[in-house]
């Protein structure tokens, strides 16, 4: 069985073209009962994604396609602690967009699964992430033989993904136009790393098998990994930090003091 573990929505600004209702319709049309939302560098659409999944009886998986100026990995949430760490990972990346992904994940890799296709970063990550939580990603545009070689060298399992950005090939030109606008470039001057090819559309299981005919184990691994991911989510109760200050005036003074300390720490001056 195949599960889409790398899908981008309109909440990947200037990249993704799929609305959340469209994602639900595509998953149901392919008889898929589990789906991951892995927008670029953010969880902006995740709560709405969970709501749509509940209405469509689809199991929602939280994730992020973490992209810096130098590196890229796919991160999926295993448990609640992993979700908290994913939030920390995203915040760290936005604090330093040129930072090293390995340095970030070294602090916050507990409770998440990491998939990558670049052998150099996978080697770094394998020094502190166990092979039970680190995988080689086979996505459109990569040769099966190349990914297999990386897998054998690092002794890591392969997981196939669709790296989805749009519904079908006819939407590729729109994706290209958005990327050109985002990069302040013409279509002809776009760098090949700035956009996706027309292969990054939402495929059915049969179409994924056709794409990767020699990697059935990697396709099945997507189901295996999805079963290990957190899919039960509750956003009903608002979570506030515990603060035992009965007097409202004292609470306001404490809040003002903490904000001032934090602002000075972050900005150096007020």
PLM region descriptions:
Residues 1-270:
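Phosphodiester-processing cores and adjacent nucleic acid-binding clamps
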